[in-house]
A protein has these predicted regions:
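Leucine-biased recognition of intrinsically disordered, low-complexity hydrophobic segments
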Residues: 13-14, 25-27, 42
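N-terminal secretory signal peptides that target proteins for export/translocation
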Residues: 1-22
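Sec-dependent signal peptide recognition
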Residues: 24-35
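N-terminal signal peptide c-region/cleavage motif recognized by signal peptidases
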Residues: 38-39
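Extended acidic/polar, glycine-enriched regions
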Residues: 139-179
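Active-site-adjacent mobile loop/cap segments within catalytic or ligand-binding domains
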Residues: 162, 273, 315-323, 349, ...
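Active-site/substrate-binding loop(s) of hydrolase catalytic cores
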Residues: 180-196, 202-347, 369-378
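Extreme N-terminal flexible tails
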Residues: 42-144, 151
């Protein structure tokens, strides 16, 4: 039988994490007792005479699962680590019918809430938003109920569509075929997965782009792919931009968390976007070694973009007065983009520097350059992401090329 990926943490665990994992194991043990009489199975699958439900795929996470009746399933979705943790509850599982019966799924989120509207797919590749009539959410958003009509074929149900390690590998391989782009393994994650970078030809100035520090933030990953596609295009603008700036991309910083269906952390129990300063985790350490190497080569950082997702699209930037220049790069860039897509809702959200050890604060405090967190709303239409990301990329390139 399959074993749960949820128990695959490695490395030394802090006492609080041991306690939390003990609680989760107790929940599973309790579910196992029920399973003996109900016919349900836990770990990364459960089943009845009506259907089999499993999460035995990259990005899968169903927490504790049991059939309370042959056609009713209860899920308890818990974070990978004890709070405090961002309450972005992730779930992703596959329902394989054995009989053609309607099924009700009830997801209870522990230390989290129903942040994401469920998406469904018959093949794990093409996704759509589940119809409103099939979903209900409790007033406090702690319980999500899904009613599925009779069906005979398997169905993936997920907080967001899957964008997993294999998808990144294929995408990065296609980008690495560009004559100006090289691929480099910077290091390994806690579970031994490669931390891959794409690097263009060396120039006096460098632009950094990062992604997927937080596993559930799919829309940020989609935006980054479309944005980067424009940077590597064959337009006069893109060619001029690459002729001046070296590009360093690390699109998948947390491959272990993505594979395990985590809410936030890597396998070390750390929010990687709070490790830019301590540099305690191998994923961030590997990137820091590359940054040090580029610094030692005398190449000047000019911009950092870090792609994420949140409830509403926004760009976290520095305050205009944080720079000596007359022109505020971020405002200029975003104003130009807005003129070309006035129908796309996003916020320019300048913030004062803080002590939070994230990518944005690290690059600003270290290099005094524009360092921007590029956030795309969770439920933004995917067609709008594909349409607007290249425009953001074009206007970024124009503004950067105008700067001294």
């Amino acid at each position: 039988m399959s074993t749960s990926k949820r128990s695959s943490h490695s490395g030394k665990l802090l006492s609080s994490r041991v306690s939390w994992h003990t609680v989760r194991l107790m929940l599973k043990a309790a579910a196992a007792t029920i399973a003996l009489s109900s016919g349900s199975v836990l770990a990364d699958f459960c089943e009845s005479d009506i259907a089999l439900i499993d999460s035995n795929f990259s990005g899968g996470n169903l927490g504790v699962c049991e059939f309370t009746t042959p056609t009713s399933v209860s899920f308890t979705i818990t974070p990978e680590d004890a709070p405090p943790i961002n309450p972005s509850a992730w779930y992703s599982f596959r329902l394989s019918p054995k009989q053609n019966e309607a099924i009700q799924l009830s997801l209870t989120f522990v230390d989290g809430h129903a942040r994401y509207w469920p998406k469904v797919s018959t093949d794990g590749a093409t996704w759509q938003r589940l119809d409103d009539s099939q979903v209900s959410i409790s007033e406090d958003r702690s319980i999500l109920t899904i009613t599925l009509e009779r069906r005979s074929d398997p169905l993936f149900i997920s907080a967001q569509e899957l964008l997993v390690n294999d998808d990144y590998e294929q995408w990065m391989r296609s980008l690495a075929a560009h004559p100006e782009v090289g691929s480099r393994t910077l290091g390994r994650s806690i579970q031994g997965r490669p931390i891959q970078a794409l690097i263009t030809e060396q120039k006096p100035e460098v632009v950094y782009l990062f992604g997927r520090q937080h596993p559930p933030e799919i829309t940020g990953g989609l935006a980054m792919q479309s944005f980067v596609g424009e940077l590597f295009g064959d337009s006069d603008l893109a060619n001029e931009f690459r002729a001046r700036f070296m590009l360093v991309l690390v699109p998948l910083i947390n491959p272990d968390g993505v594979d395990a269906g985590h809410w936030r952390h890597n396998m070390g129990g750390r929010d990687l976007n709070r490790d830019w300063g301590p540099f305690t985790q191998p994923e961030i350490q590997s990137i820091k070694r590359l940054i040090n190497e580029i610094d030692e080569g005398g190449i000047a950082p000019k911009l950092m973009l870090d792609f994420h997702s949140t409830q509403r699209s926004r760009f976290y930037t520095q305050m205009p007065e944080d720079f000596d220049e007359e022109i505020d790069f971020a405002r200029d860039w975003l104003d130009r983009a807005r003129l070309r897509m006035s129908d796309f809702d996003f916020l320019y959200d300048p913030r004062k520097p803080s002590g939070q050890e994230n990518t944005k604060n690290y690059f600003y405090s270290t290099y005094h350059i524009p360092a921007i967190t590029y956030e795309i709303g969770d439920e933004v239409d995917r067609g709008d992401i594909s349409r607007t990301s290249p425009i953001f990329a074009q206007e970024m390139m124009r503004v950067m090329l105008e700067r001294e």
